[in-house]
């Protein structure tokens, strides 16, 4: 989808490059989450792993609980309206078991009270039901939208669960500056400009923006960075920006580049490529071979974008394509996004659903939740025919403000798109099942090596980082049967002010005490649920804690656990080998001889990966904290840099970020900065944390 966001505020004036004149774009305040493509990280979410789908019990359910559940339902039926609404079935602890909607709530609830004919899943739900709450709605479409919202919010055990509420990224070409910027954007589309999307992932946006910069030379820097330039930055040197900040291109020329980029993203790619080809031929005919080569490179960048897109349909302008595949009790929904006739990526989802759900049931529930907080396209193409497709289409049409079609194509190009999505769903689920099986074998092998009673379902790995005690931070990563659970990573800014600089033991003590005191507090507040797994079967309590270090670190952590009264959590320390060689690590466990595994042992490689991931995460957290500290302090903390040199550096580089990126040689080119001072500045920004 391409959208415009305009602001009636007074236009902002240009930064006076040649030819800018008074012709400006609308001004306005920048809001939303705008992201420099250079800083894009891989999206992480619950859908990166398979949900836990327990086997359904085959034992008959006792008549007593069923009778109690039916009695609760019959009581609700007597007071239920015959109008549309949403109902919530809850157990005695008032946990929501199921959220449903109905055109006639009383009739729907009556169907649960029948003494026979219920499938096992429904019977188990009835047996657990203690109370029912009802919310009436004006229409059935309103009930459908409310049901989807409540399922995402409450995550009931007996519903299909999407397990992902992240918004999708868009490409934004800003409209509040005379020299528009191209960037990734998430969130409310309140900043003036043109929005193109949604894209399947931040990575897809980053790759597209990089290629667009090569093709159209549109800037990606922030407005503050732009305004502070006195010379072109590196992106100009590598031909990924036209350099409007310092007048390397005039206003009409840059406006033409932005228009071409907008036309390309709006689906007019053929016209843009034909125009660039004409310009290339003209430059070649004029013997301006350097200019012709620039047009050639821009055409190649556009071709690279289109080759990454794969399928670009001829008859589908704007559509989302959904296909579902079930195997081994799991479901995979593959989604392809087509906008302006272009394929803007695809993504696999693994919704949580009990094994008795049919593909049609899973897909229908998935769609309602998927569009709960996302704008629907004009057409939604499906691999399976879902119930109430017309109701869903009506609800999404009301939500979008335009007609939305929900179709299961039978022939032609649309059918081919669905078949392609179905192939991708089948392959994605196959890969995920294989990865999960490998992870399961590694966890079982780890349990065997360490003598654990069972394969760990939750492993927590801890590390800390600092430079001579400053900007100290601890970090925890989490792994389980589905791999690394990045949405459960945590960082701990060290709060203690009386720590001896570099006291790793004290830092680790603070991190572990904060982590496990919180768990103990939660257990005391709700002892009945303390040992239950969280939703999606990730326990709160770890089976195994791993720390980076030797016997001394292990004994220190053991003392912390003894003081907290923790005995159910297994501990292990991983000490690096001689010369810090990977493959020669020693494993330390309480009251057991040290363990050395063969360098090629898969379990050792798995442990190394966990330790290295913890180190990567804590180093990244430390650097973010340190950069924030440095930027707040400016250059005042750099030894030997007074006000005059500070002004010279900022005048030469424009921003503190550029000073941080500069090499020793670049720093030495600044007037008044000696080779010794350049080395001090470089070392200040690049000293490796401990």
From Swiss-Prot:
GO CC, alphabetical: cytoplasm; excinuclease repair complex
InterPro entries: GIY-YIG_endonuc, GIY-YIG_endonuc_sf, GIY-YIG_UvrC_Cho, Hlx-hairpin-Hlx_DNA-bd_motif, RuvA_2-like, UVR_dom, UVR_dom_sf, UvrABC_protein_C
Keywords noted in UniProt: Cytoplasm, DNA damage, DNA excision, DNA repair, Excision nuclease, SOS response
Region Disordered: start-end pairs: 1-60
Family, per entry: Belongs to the UvrC family.
Function according to Swiss-Prot or TrEMBL: The UvrABC repair system catalyzes the recognition and processing of DNA lesions. UvrC both incises the 5' and 3' sides of the lesion. The N-terminal half is responsible for the 3' incision and the C-terminal half is responsible for the 5' incision.
Subunit structure: Interacts with UvrB in an incision complex.
Protein name: UvrABC system protein C
Organism: Nitrobacter hamburgensis (strain DSM 10229 / NCIMB 13809 / X14)
């Amino acid at each position: 989808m391409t959208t415009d966001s305009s602001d009636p505020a007074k236009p902002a004036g240009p930064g006076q490059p040649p030819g800018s004149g008074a012709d400006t774009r609308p001004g306005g305040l920048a809001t939303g989450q705008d992201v420099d493509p250079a800083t894009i990280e891989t999206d992480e979410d619950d859908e990166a792993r398979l949900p836990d789908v327990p086997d359904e019990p085959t034992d008959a359910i006792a008549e007593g609980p069923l009778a109690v559940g039916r009695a609760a339902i019959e009581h609700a039926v007597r007071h239920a309206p015959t109008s549309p609404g949403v109902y919530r079935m809850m157990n005695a602890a008032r946990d929501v078991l199921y959220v449903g909607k109905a055109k006639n709530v009383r009739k729907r609830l009556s169907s649960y009270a029948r003494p026979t004919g219920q499938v096992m899943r429904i019977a188990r739900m009835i047996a657990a039901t203690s109370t029912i709450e009802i919310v009436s709605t004006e229409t059935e479409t309103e009930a459908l939208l409310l049901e989807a919202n409540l399922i995402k919010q409450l995550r009931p055990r007996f519903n299909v669960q999407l397990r992902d509420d992240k918004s999708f990224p868009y490409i934004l070409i800003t409209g509040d500056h005379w020299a528009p910027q191209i960037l990734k954007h998430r969130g409310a589309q309140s900043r003036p400009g043109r929005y193109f999307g949604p894209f399947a992932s931040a990575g897809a946006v980053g790759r597209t923006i990089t290629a667009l910069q090569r093709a159209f030379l549109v800037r990606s820097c922030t407005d503050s960075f732009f305004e502070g330039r006195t010379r072109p930055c590196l992106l100009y040197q590598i031909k990924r920006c036209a350099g409007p900040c310092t007048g390397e291109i005039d206003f009409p020329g840059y406006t033409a580049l932005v228009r071409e980029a907008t036309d390309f993203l709006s689906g007019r790619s053929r016209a843009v490529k034909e125009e660039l080809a004409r310009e290339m031929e003209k430059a070649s005919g004029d013997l301006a071979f350097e200019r012709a080569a620039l047009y050639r490179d821009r055409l190649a960048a556009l071709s690279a974008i289109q080759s990454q897109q794969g399928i670009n349909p001829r008859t589908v302008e704007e559509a989302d394509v959904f296909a579902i595949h079930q195997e081994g009790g799991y479901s995979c929904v593959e989604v392809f996004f087509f906008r302006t006739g272009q394929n803007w990526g695809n993504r696999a989802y693994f919704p949580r659903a009990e094994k008795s759900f049919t593909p049609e049931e899973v897909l229908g529930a998935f769609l309602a939740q998927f569009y709960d907080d996302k704008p629907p396209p004009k057409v939604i193409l499906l691999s399976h025919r879902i119930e109430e497709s017309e109701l869903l289409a009506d609800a999404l049409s009301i939500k979008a403000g335009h007609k939305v079609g929900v179709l299961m194509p039978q022939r032609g190009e649309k059918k081919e798109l669905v078949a392609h999505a179905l192939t991708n769903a089948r392959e994605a689920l196959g890969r995920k099942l294989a990865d999960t099986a490998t992870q399961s074998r590694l966890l079982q092998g780890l349990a065997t090596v360490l003598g654990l009673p069972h394969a760990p379902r939750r492993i927590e790995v801890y590390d800390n980082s600092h430079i001579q005690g400053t900007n100290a931070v601890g970090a925890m990563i989490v792994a389980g049967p589905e791999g690394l659970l990045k949405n459960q990573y945590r960082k701990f800014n060290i709060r203690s002010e009386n720590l001896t600089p570099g006291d790793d033991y004290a830092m680790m003590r603070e991190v572990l005490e904060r982590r496990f005191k919180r768990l103990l507090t939660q257990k005391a507040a709700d002892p009945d649920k303390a040992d239950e797994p969280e939703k999606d079967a990730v326990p709160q309590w770890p089976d195994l804690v791993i720390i980076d270090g030797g016997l001394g670190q292990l004994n220190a952590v053991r003392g912390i656990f003894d003081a907290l009264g923790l005995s159910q959590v297994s501990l292990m320390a991983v000490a690096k080998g001689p010369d810090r060689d990977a493959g020669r690590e020693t494993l330390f466990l309480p009251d057991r001889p040290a363990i050395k595994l063969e360098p090629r042992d898969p379990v050792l490689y798995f442990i190394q990966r966990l330790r290295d991931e913890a180190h990567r995460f804590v180093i990244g957290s430390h650097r973010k904290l340190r950069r924030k500290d440095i930027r707040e302090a400016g250059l005042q903390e750099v030894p030997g840099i007074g006000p005059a040199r500070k002004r010279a550096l900022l005048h030469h580089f424009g921003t503190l970020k550029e000073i941080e990126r500069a090499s020793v040689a670049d720093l030495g080119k600044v007037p008044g900065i000696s080779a010794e001072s350049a080395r001090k500045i470089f070392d200040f920004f690049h000293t490796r944390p401990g």
